[in-house]
Each structure stands twice: as structure tokens, then as C-alpha cells.
Amino acid sequence: MGRAIGIDLGTTNSCVAIMQGKDTKVIENKEGARTTPSIVALTSSGERLIGAPAKRQATTNASNTFFATKRLIGRQYSDPEMKNLSVPYKVFAAKSGDAWVKTTDNKEYSPSQIGAFILQNMKEAAEAYLGEEVKDAVITVPAYFNDSQRQATKDAGKIAGLNVLRIVNEPTAAALAYGLDKKHGHTIVVYDLGGGTFDVSILEIGDGVFEVKATNGDTHLGGEDFDNGVVSYLLDEFKKSNGIDLKNDPMAMQRIKEAAEKAKIELSSAMETEINLPFITADASGPKHLNMKLTRAKLESLVNDLIERTMAPCKKALEDAGLSASQIGEVVLVGGMTRMPKVIEKVKEFFGKDPHRGVNPDEVVAIGAAIQAGIIQGDVRDVLLLDVTPLSLGIETLGGVFTPLIERNTTIPTKKSQVFSTAEDNQTAVTIKVHQGERKLAVDNKLLGQFSLEGIPPAPRGRPQIEVTFDIDANGIAHVSAKDKATGKEQKIRIQSSGGLSDDEINRMVKEAEEKAQEDEKRKKFIEVKNQADSLVHSTEKSLTEYGDKVSPEDRSAIENAVNELKEVSKSDNIDDADSIQQKVTNLSQLSMKLGEAMYQASQQNSAENGFSSEGNPNDKEEKVVDSDYQDIDNKEENK
């Protein structure tokens, strides 16, 4: 078995880590950073940029730069959370009803594909570090992700060419990283406020056992919402001062969003910051600039309701665990937003103790994922992880009522069976709708899918005995099987969700990813050969200027023609022209050897004229070599 990596696929940033012996190592990306922005951009030339390069060009390519797509993964376009989505790129309803994204040239991508591009980047960083291919990975998700979101994340891993060993809840992974060396048992809370989601989990840890007692959260609450609060304030203030609404200006909106995020980060350590965006727009009177100061107090007032929203899940998690705040031994902060002083203050106020700050909130989840990978591969022993399902799983019963079969916070993996029957005489088929959630009515919960049991022998209603088994695996993903108790015939049933990616779609995306990897390799070769061509043209033209008169007119003409041909072919942006450019490079290199010979001969001639030869200075033969007298000071001192 090869090396397995742990990946934190975040809304704002992603991180990859690996076990090395008993230690963990966070792997740096190509830019030397330990985290990578979860941003993917498609350029007009067809190039795909990931991470910091994508973020740098977002202002000028906002409509084709996809960020925070983790908020779309596994979601239907009709979901209530989609209504308040504020992004510069196009989000639309795919045929399945899922929320997908679209470029300005109408190329369509599922959020799982965008996630796969980021996972591929993480995979490549690990392979560059290890010097070997990586196939296996543990990927983290918010604890409050439902079945569809977990499955969509697993699909992203498959599209990226990874075998997903396990889907792990982010707070649980953080607890693993925090408590691996803790021997004495105690209860901890992991408060995880990231870029797009909020989770809170309560765990009992000690002697290698990590048992999740309860979890809660909000999959649409995070740093993006804090940024949007600042953006709204800046837009309103600018409109008041200048009478111009910038909401429909994508480039201005992208600049303001970046400035808002930067200001938010700065105000975690400073009391005041200045936002200065020159030439943000223009009207008949000339260019307009956005220049205003933002204080920490103002920021806190803008986002206070968001911080307050994190308290209700904390309260619910404590209730589900049957604990009070005073019974919590440690509060571990995870996620970049937990650096905000107001968040720290609110957590301290709620739990009555200073939060633990001994972990890096940006890296701890990836480290925990790497530890889980080590556990699965047998590299980490004597550690038992007992996680829970965050949401109840059940079916729709008579009158549209939601009947839970597996309650939330049930330790996973778990299995529960229920016997169903027919509602009418001689009924030969039964349709079962599977839902996930906590609402009383099935329609208010997430419909995971539905399936039909067919071929039931005709009988009076209520007579057939159909045992349906609901199974949640260690990834938190649901499976269903059915058994006709009368005949003993058993059938495994796959839940066919109304949304999600089909096997054919996943296979197509895997193939596209492989083809794109080949195209990326071709593009890399194309860029390298163009750089080689530019360098050769520059050096050859310089040599022609200095030594062109040292070669025959015929040779000089041939070299000049070769230079012009290489210049012309190098203008191409078609990656398929790499071989043509390489041929011209080879041709010019061979012709330039004549120049090299002329340069060498000129160098030899200069040496001879200055009285030097390869044997040395001839005048040296006339001189006598005289050994100088010396005294050994140390010995002289000793002999005194």
C-alpha cells in the first residue's frame, strides 16, 4: 500500500498533510505556502489556474474565477441557501436540479469537479514532496454535511484520481490532532468556524479513544458571510457619498471583496485599518476612489449577529450530550475566523473558560486527516475513533410525516431495520422516500432519494412483510437494503437521489480530468520550449551584433533567417505547436555553432595579442623565481 495523505478541502483554503513516522507534516504547495486558496480560474486561453495564481487574477476575470464552491457541493439549486448567494460567477440549475457553475463561454462544471481540481492540486503537491504517486486520501467535511454533500465530496475525490479511504468530520479530525498525545480522559468542545461552515462537536477523549458525544452546526455560516457584511457596508457608504451603486460592476465588486477580507484579517490584530481603492469607478465628473477607515468596533457591530448564530448550535450540542458548559474541560478553536477577538470573547463567555490556542486553526484539520489515514493504514495504533451521524435518517410515512429510523448523534457505523407492508390489497410495489433532517414533516427535510420495492406477491394489505435496513457507514453515507421475509429474497438497493452525479457523469469527469492532466503537461512543455526559444533568440541576436562580421555572409544570413523563423513560430499560443517551435530551436542552435566558433577564435586572438597563450604568459619564462626568507615566529618564541 502506498502513502496516504490527509486533505482539508476548505471553503476558503485547503491544506494537505501526511504522517511521517509518529509525526505529521503539512506539505507546502508550489508557491511554498502551507495552505492553498480554494479558488479555480479558467482563463481565456483555456489554462486552468488553482490557488494563489487564480486569486491574483480574480479582479480581471471575476466571472470565470470560482471560489467558495464548497457551499454549492451536494446542493440543489432550489435550496433556500442558494437565494442569498452572492458570487460574480454564474450559478445555474443542472438537469439533475443540482447547483452547477458556468463560465462566460458556457462551459459547465459541477461543484464536485471544481473541488476535484483543488484536490488534484493537493495530490500533486504531496507527490512532488514524496517523489512517488499518491492514490489514497482521507478527506474532511463539515460535521453538519448531509448525505448528498458527503457523497458529492467523495465524488470529487474520485474525479481527482484519489481512492477516498474515509470521509472524516472536520471537528473530529481537529480533535485527533489535538488529543493524540493526551492520556488522561476529559471532555472537549471543538468550535470550528471556517470560511463557509460552522461546526461544534463535543468529544470525550483519553487512552486513545475519541468518542463524539454530539455535534451540531450550520453549513452556511462562515468567513464568507463576515466578508459579505463588510462588503455591504462599503457599498452603502460609497453610494451615500457618491450616488453610485457598484453592485453590478463585477470588477469593482471583486476589488471590494478582496479589500473587505484583508481589512477583516487586519482588524484581528489592529484597532483600525484603512481601505483605499483608487479608480474604483468613474462617472461624467471623472474617476471615483473608495477611501474609508474601518475600526474593529465597527466590524464587530457588522458581524455580531453572525457570531451570535454560532451560539445556538453550541447550546444544542451541550443538550444532546447531556452536559453543561462547566463540565467541558477544554475548548479547541479551529478555522481562520476563530482568530477574531470578538469570536474568542464570545466563546469564552459561553463556555466560561479561555479557549485553547495551542493548535494552528488553519492546519489542524489536515493534520487530523493525516492521522486518520495513518490509523486506517496501520501506521497509528491503539487509537479508536467513534464518530456520529449529525442528522436523523428516516422515511416519509402516512400523511407526509417524517419518521426517523436512525436518530442524530448515533455512533457510526450503524444499522437499523424496520418492517414495512402494503397499504392496499394486492399491492405489488411500495415506494419508499428516504429523508435526512430534524423537521417533523418529511417535505421540510432533505430528500436523499426514493426507491421502489417491486414484485411483491399479491396479498391482502398489511400482510406482506418487507424488512428495510438503513445503514450508515463510517463516512456518514447512507445505504439501504430490503428483504422479503416471506420468500427470504434479499435485495441491495441504491438510493437514487433526484440530484447528485450519476456513475456515467463521474466517469466522464474522471476521463476529462485525465485528459486535462495530459493537456496541462503539454501546456507546461509548450511554455518551457517558448521560454527556451526566447532565450536562444536573445543570446543569438546579441552574438550576431558582436561577432556577426566574423562569420561568412552565407552563414550570417542563414542564422538571421533561422532567428526570424523562430520568432515567427514562437508567436503562436497553440500548445500543439510545441514540436514546431522545438524544431526551429534545434535548427537555430545548430546554425549558431558557427557563431560560437567565431567567438572562440576571437577570444584566442585577444589572448595572443595581450601576450598570453594557453600555456601561460611567455614572459614568465624570462623571470627567475625567488624563494623569500621567512621566520617561524611561533618556534622562535618557543626557543627563547
UniProtKB/Swiss-Prot annotation:
Keyword set includes ATP-binding: yes
Region (Disordered): 537-556, 599-640
InterPro entries linked: ATPase_NBD, Chaperone_DnaK, Heat_shock_70_CS, HSP70_C_sf, HSP70_peptide-bd_sf, Hsp_70_fam
Coiled-coil spans in chain: none
Protein's UniProt keywords contain Phosphoprotein: yes
Compositional bias segments (type: Basic and acidic residues): 539-556, 618-640
Induction profile: By stress conditions e.g. heat shock.
GO molecular function: ATP binding; ATP-dependent protein folding chaperone; unfolded protein binding
UniProt modified residues of type Phosphothreonine: T197
Keywords attached to this entry: ATP-binding, Chaperone, Nucleotide-binding, Phosphoprotein, Stress response
Biased composition annotated in UniProt, kind: Polar residues: 601-617
Alphabetized NCBIfam families for the sequence: PRK00290.1 (NF001413), PRK05183.1 (NF003520), prok_dnaK (TIGR02350)
Family named by the database record: Belongs to the heat shock protein 70 family.
PANTHER family: HEAT SHOCK PROTEIN 70KDA
Function according to Swiss-Prot or TrEMBL: Acts as a chaperone.
Name listed for the protein in its UniProt record: Chaperone protein DnaK
Organism of this sequence: Wolbachia sp. subsp. Drosophila simulans (strain wRi)
